[in-house]
Amino acid sequence: MNMGVDKKQNTVLYISSAIALLFVLWGVFLPENMANVVNKVFALLTTNFGWLYLLAVAIFIIFVFGIAISRYGKIKLGADDDKPEFSNFQWFAMLFGGGMGIGLVFWSVAEPIMHFNSPPFGEPGTVEAMQTSMRVVFFHWGIHAWVNFAIAGLALAYFQFRKGLPFLISSAFYPLIGDRIYGPIGKAIDILAVFATIFGIATSLGLGSSQIATGIQYIWGIPAGPLTISLVIAVITVIFTLATVSGLHKAMQSIANVKVWLSVAFMVFIFYFGGKVFILNTFTQSLGDYLQNFVGQTFWMANESWVGGWTIFYWAWWIAWAPFVGQFVARVSKGRTIREFVFAVTLLPVGFSFIWLAIYGGAAFNLDQISGGFIQNAVNADYTTALFALLQQMPLYAITGPLAILLIVTCFVGAADSATYVLAMLTSNGDMDPSKKLRSFWGIMQGAMTIVLIVVGGTAALKALQTASIASAFPFMLIMLVMCYSILKALRSDHP
């Protein structure tokens, strides 16, 4: 099959697509075997290597901010005379947009309530548990997440815009292995980047489709089982794949605009009806707790099972997303200095995320108290209902419920469309305008792999999705650690 890639140089495509297809077939024909392997891999990595995930992300934080404040921070991502392609306002808006994803919509209500009911330490259901839950949520969605994207984006932008190398993860290793980035070692690095992206996105799409199906059940009574979730994934996959094939760029842009406006509208609506003063108090308290406990929480492993199920999952998820988000922030940052890039990428989206989480989480706690535990009970029964349980406690639920589903759909379509672009680019030698056929192929494959994880996981679908991220992120985490050294070596060599 010719998917618009040079046949002589598409090793990454052939190997990646073959492994992806084998994974799908494994889940279809041997689901119980896959489920057993999933459980064993999850236990192995979280039990034996949890410490490494925590240390790696801590190293990433030190590295990326160290580079930014050093003399290398003045270096441009591009030629010395390159100007930024976008104004500051446009650039900031794009980075803010990067923070609005399926995961944020999914977890912004569910996670605070889940930590409130089962905190990592202390008594559940107390004021202290509420404060701890919001602190932990800020921790999981804060700087520790975005430093991963900053490192991948910095590597892609520096070696593409300043050195003229392909827009591939393997290019970041040129200072270490030279032209061997075009050989087996470089191909292996790009293949690992492909699978980190596939499983990181599959986790997000799995969560998003589950929430859509639950919303349909919550509002219209249609059961939200694996079949419904699979149909949701299939239908949306067909939509964005057809849009890609047809070249309906205006349609995709319209969907992106709807996502932004709906996101802002929901934030304003929930802030107004969710208890403005309570939310502002929640934001202030949570931000202070986050900053005060930043270092200690970074290395905290006293409750290994909790850390394995939450923090390590998040760190792996963000690492798996690094090639995906990294290429986005790199593409829009040509002409920026390293210092501008690092501080904008790590702080602006985090600020937006904190506001979002404080509004949704604060409103959830406030309205849960007023309703006598309605939201808490809903989350205990099924955490995917959290957002709809919150909206049910506010006016205009007949309107906001369906609009919430529309918001999740726009997030799903946007993430899937961007993911297929990244996967097509990674498997076409860094071509920044990959063929529609190749993007369509990865769109279909992405949907199929997400369905496999949902069906194989069954009642434990979340664990299957978590394991997919943790397992795919492990080798890429090691790649990112070496990548940090390679970036530093390049900077020292180019700017002694």
Curated annotation (Swiss-Prot):
Organism of provenance: Desulfitobacterium hafniense (strain Y51)
Subcellular localization(s) per the UniProt record: Cell membrane
Membrane topology designation: Multi-pass membrane protein
Keyword list, A-Z: Cell membrane, Membrane, Transmembrane, Transmembrane helix, Transport
Transmembrane segment boundaries: 11-31, 49-69, 89-109, 136-156, 188-208, 219-239, 260-280, 306-326, 341-361, 396-416, 441-461, 468-488
Chain's role: Probably acts in the uptake of glycine betaine. May function in the pathway that allows anaerobic methylotrophic growth of D.hafniense using glycine betaine.
Protein name: Probable glycine betaine transporter
Keyword match Cell membrane: yes
GO molecular function, one term: transmembrane transporter activity
